[in-house]
Curated annotation (Swiss-Prot):
<dbReference type="InterPro" id="IPR026875">
    <property type="entry name" value="PHydrolase_assoc_dom"/>
</dbReference>
<dbReference type="InterPro" id="IPR003607">
    <property type="entry name" value="HD/PDEase_dom"/>
</dbReference>
<dbReference type="Pfam" id="PF13286">
    <property type="entry name" value="HD_assoc"/>
</dbReference>
<dbReference type="InterPro" id="IPR051094">
    <property type="entry name" value="Diverse_Catalytic_Enzymes"/>
</dbReference>
<feature type="domain" description="HD">
    <location>
        <begin position="75"/>
        <end position="219"/>
    </location>
</feature>
<dbReference type="Pfam" id="PF01966">
    <property type="entry name" value="HD"/>
</dbReference>
<dbReference type="InterPro" id="IPR006674">
    <property type="entry name" value="HD_domain"/>
</dbReference>
<protein>
    <recommendedName>
        <fullName>Deoxyguanosinetriphosphate triphosphohydrolase-like protein</fullName>
    </recommendedName>
</protein>
<dbReference type="InterPro" id="IPR023023">
    <property type="entry name" value="dNTPase_2"/>
</dbReference>
<dbReference type="InterPro" id="IPR006261">
    <property type="entry name" value="dGTPase"/>
</dbReference>
<keyword id="KW-0378">Hydrolase</keyword>
<dbReference type="GO" id="GO:0016793">
    <property type="term" value="F:triphosphoric monoester hydrolase activity"/>
</dbReference>
<comment type="similarity">
    <text>Belongs to the dGTPase family. Type 2 subfamily.</text>
</comment>
């Protein structure tokens, strides 16, 4: 019996001409039969959600390492918020929502324990062997390190999902093969030798909305978490004209509103304003370029989903506020220093004695490896750790573990 795809709610008739077509995917590295009940992009999204890497995001830091209280964001809650915004943008622009959501859900898979602090520490110890890049690590996870399926390593995602993962922040190299932001990480080059992700072009519009959704989400929720932690005040927010205007709107409409509700009303207005700004810019640029296919978007030579000049300035001001008031706060810096030492200590311990990893797969795999491969293997193990697991292992192996609270 033939399944009516539109009757299943895939809604391809609602897609714009420039949207990625789930029925015309460029395929998977290992060919698979299509599902009669789900599009290829739906299957990608579902595979991503069922991974151990996705579950581990629950115990990985967003900003506040080992924070007291259950209301601060983690990588998982951040990822879910990004996916919601990406899906809303995709619907407004008549894109494939499943592809946009999938890219949003997978974009942080490669993050280490302790956020960017852990990544910096791991990059430093791995620098002699090519360093560490969380985006390249995300690709390694979904193409190699997740071991779930009988016929292949990784998730065997479609070309479009992998392209979106690797290029959601823009092209990685020039047409003549030069890296645009430094050397292209070797894991990305290695995969492209098997399955060319066309690193010199832009990604699909679905991937672009996932990228800008990431900016919108963390700009908003880092303010929320900063207020909750006491690192930010409403007076500090008033220094930014955009936020000052939102605060006046809320105050005028709801005078005397309690602090938590006041904060929420500001945040929801901030998200709405930023989303509407991106939609307006994307519609304008699409009207100028008039792409007739997803390929036309990739070859347009510029990003389609981005902020206006005015909102870009607001974005810059918010990032500067977050950097000076939160990310470089003395207490945050103290905790970051301790977190970095945990990652460095564990790396050295595992390199000296791999049996300390205590997991047979990782120990067995490292036997006989040359030092560069051994270092990358230990890096993979460390990158997969959650904050809580890294702390507990450090306590088992060392007499003193830094207090991260």
């Amino acid at each position: 019996m033939t399944v009516d795809r539109q009757a299943l709610g895939f809604g391809y008739g609602e897609h714009a001409a420039y949207a990625s077509n789930p029925w015309a995917s460029r395929g998977r590295l290992y060919p698979e039969a299509s599902s009669p009940t789900r599009s290829d992009f739906q299957r990608d999204r579902d595979r991503i959600v069922h991974t151990t890497a996705f579950r581990r995001l629950k115990h990985k830091t967003q900003v506040f390492i080992a924070a007291d209280g259950d209301h601060y964001r983690t990588r998982l809650t951040h990822t879910i918020e990004v996916a919601q915004i990406a899906r809303a943008l995709a619907r407004a622009l008549k894109l494939d929502e499943d592809l946009a959501e999938g890219v949003a859900l997978v974009h942080d898979f490669g993050h280490t324990p302790f956020g960017h602090t852990g990544e910096d520490a791991l990059h430093e110890v791995l620098e002699p062997y090519g360093g560490f890049d969380h985006n390249a690590q995300s690709l390694r996870i979904v193409t190699k390190l997740e071991r779930r399926y009988a016929e292949f390593d990784g998730l065997n995602l479609t070309w479009e999902s992998l392209e979106g993962l690797v290029k959601h922040n823009g092209p990685l190299m020039t047409a003549d093969g030069q890296g645009l932001r430094g050397p292209v990480p070797q894991p990305i080059l290695d995969y492209c030798a098997l399955h060319d992700l066309e690193l010199a072009s832009f990604a699909s519009l679905e991937a672009q909305v996932a990228a800008i959704a990431d900016d919108i989400a963390y700009n908003t929720h880092d303010i929320d978490d900063g207020l909750r932690a006491g690192y930010l005040t409403f007076e500090m927010l008033e220094e930014i004209p955009f936020l000052a205007r939102l605060m006046r709107e809320v105050h005028d409409r709801y005078p005397g509103l309690e602090s938590s509700r006041f904060t929420h009303e500001i945040m929801r207005r901030q998200i709405t304003a930023m989303v509407e700004d991106v939609i307006a810019v994307a519609q304008k640029r699409l009207g100028e370029v008039r792409p007739e296919s997803a390929k036309d978007v990739r070859c347009a030579g510029r990003v389609m989903a981005t902020f206006s000049d005015e909102m870009s300035e607001t974005d810059r001001q918010i990032k500067n506020l977050l950097m000076t008031r939160i990310y470089r706060h003395p207490e945050v810096m103290r905790v970051r220093q301790g977190a970095a030492s945990i990652v460095t200590d564990l790396y050295r311990a595992f390199m000296d004695d791999p049996s300390l990893m205590k997991e047979h797969y990782w120990i067995d795999q490292i036997a006989g490896m040359a030092e560069p491969a051994r270092a990358r293997h230990v890096g993979d193990y460390l990158a997969g750790m959650t904050d809580t697991f890294a702390i507990s292992v450090h306590r088992r192996l060392f007499d003193h573990t830094p207090d991260l609270r």
